[in-house]
A protein has these predicted regions:
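Histidine-acidic residue clusters that define the catalytic metal-binding segment
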Residues: 1-5, 144-185, 216-222, 259
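Short acidic-hydrophobic surface loop/beta-edge motif
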Residues: 3-8, 230-233
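An aromatic/glycine/proline-enriched structural segment found at the starts
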Residues: 149, 157, 181-250
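M16 family metallopeptidases and their MPP-like homologs
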Residues: 14-16, 20-53, 59-107, 120, ...
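Hydrophobic alpha-helix feature that most strongly marks membrane-spanning transmembrane helices
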Residues: 266-270, 279
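A common structural junction motif
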Residues: 104-113, 205-213
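Short, solvent-exposed amphipathic alpha-helical segments in soluble enzyme
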Residues: 203-207, 261, 279
Length: 279
């Protein structure tokens, strides 16, 4: 059975009742990602997501990791350009306790200065590593050519070394206060529970108060950059990366999803026509 509902605080839920395996797969996605980062502060959303993995008010990072492990579960928060997603997998018998940990992570983050310093330094190391990878360099050049160097869309969600250096823990707290709300959250669920059982297990999320939050504003100038060919010289690279593309329609367009399907068939996956021809 496939079902959907909305909790009193505004969080939307979609579920698929599937009892073939004793597992539950779930995710909570918020429409709050890198697009809400302020100019010069790209990386705030990314670091906020990372900090939600670093313990809660009542649990250190080690204690949280141990609590998740004791349930035979996995729960992680990640950030993309457009959204922040908590995803998880657990045994059916442990679903209620897993949801208690999810509530702790989302509603009671630890905001520990020492953990923040570690997370920030790790992010800076990742940025430095990307700067040595031909594929990452090619993607960065491509995005700036397509969207314009001044557009937030041309940035990587994890930011730059300069932007990360400028970010403080207070920036993360402000982002959390201004952008987190069940009104912009969607939960997806697949497992051997009925709709009423899932809603009962989520009753405690009523502690997450609904509020209006900032929404990303991306201009639609419709301007398409003139066609061009760009080369990036990277001596010693063992492979060449070729990126070809242009701007597409907004995702709210009725043509967007059919275009995604066609794109996947033509060349976006290992089962695509392009992959089969080249391989």
């Amino acid at each position: 059975a496939i079902w959907s509902s909305t909790l009193p605080n505004g969080m939307r839920i979609k579920g698929i009742e599937y009892g073939e395996l004793p597992l539950v797969n779930f995710s909570i996605e918020l429409n709050q990602g890198m697009l809400l980062d302020a100019p010069g502060k790209v990386g705030v959303a990314y670091l906020t997501a990372q900090m939600l993995n670093e313990g809660t008010v009542s649990k250190t990072p080690e204690q949280l990791e141990e609590a998740i492990g004791q349930l035979g579960a996995s729960i992680r928060v990640a950030c993309s350009r457009e959204s922040m997603t908590l995803s998880g997998l657990c045994l059916k018998k442990n679903f209620a306790r897993a949801m208690e940990l999810v509530e702790e992570m989302l509603l009671h983050p630890r905001w520990d200065e020492q953990s923040f310093a570690v997370v920030k330094e790790r992010a800076i190391d990742n940025v430095r590593q990307r700067a040595t990878e031909p594929e990452a360099i090619a993607q960065s050049v491509f995005d700036k050519a397509l969207y314009g160097a001044g557009s937030v869309l041309s940035e990587n969600p994890s930011g730059t070394e300069a932007s990360l250096q400028s970010i403080t823990l207070d920036d993360l707290k402000a982002f959390y206060d201004e952008c987190f709300s069940p009104k912009v959250a969607r939960m997806s669920f697949v497992g051997g529970f009925t709709q009423s059982e899932v809603e009962k297990s989520l009753a405690s999320t009523g502690n997450w108060p609904a509020k209006d939050v900032r929404q990303p504003e991306i201009g639609e100038d419709g301007a398409e950059p003139a066609g061009k060919v760009l080369f990036v010289d990277y001596p010693g690279a063992r492979q060449s990366y070729v990126l070809i593309g242009s701007k597409a329609m907004p995702m709210r367009s009725p043509e967007a999803y059919p275009a995604v399907i066609v794109n996947d068939k033509l060349g976006a996956s290992s089962g695509s026509l392009l992959f089969e021809i080249l391989r």
